[in-house]
């Protein structure tokens, strides 16, 4: 198999890796209970989505 003929510089390596970072989680507050949840998903604490109760959540007390 062919091998690289010339060595790549640190700048070229870093330019290639510029898009390899992780993006932070975009959590938003639930309008019903106020706890943080992922957007476009059912709240795991109160079970609501877009103002409607979708799932029944048992209290973890």
From Swiss-Prot:
- InterPro entries cross-referenced by the UniProt entry: Ribosomal_bL32 (IPR002677), Ribosomal_bL32_bact (IPR044957), Ribosomal_zn-bd (IPR011332)
Q: What is this protein called?
A: Large ribosomal subunit protein bL32
Q: Tell me the gene name.
A: rpmF
Keywords recorded for this protein, A-Z: Ribonucleoprotein, Ribosomal protein
Q: Name one GO cellular component term.
A: large ribosomal subunit
The question of whether Ribosomal protein is a record keyword is answered with yes
The parts of the chain that form a coiled coil are none
Keyword Nucleus belongs to the record: no
> What GO terms describe the biological role, i.e. biological process, of this protein?
translation
Single GO MF annotation:
structural constituent of ribosome
* Family according to the record: Belongs to the bacterial ribosomal protein bL32 family.
């Amino acid at each position: 198999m062919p091998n690289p003929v010339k060595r790549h510089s640190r700048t070229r390596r870093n330019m290639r890796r510029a898009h390899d970072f992780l993006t932070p989680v975009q959590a938003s507050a639930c309008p019903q209970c106020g706890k943080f949840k992922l957007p476009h998903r059912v709240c795991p604490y109160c079970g609501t989505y877009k103002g409607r109760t979708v799932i029944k959540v048992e209290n973890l007390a």
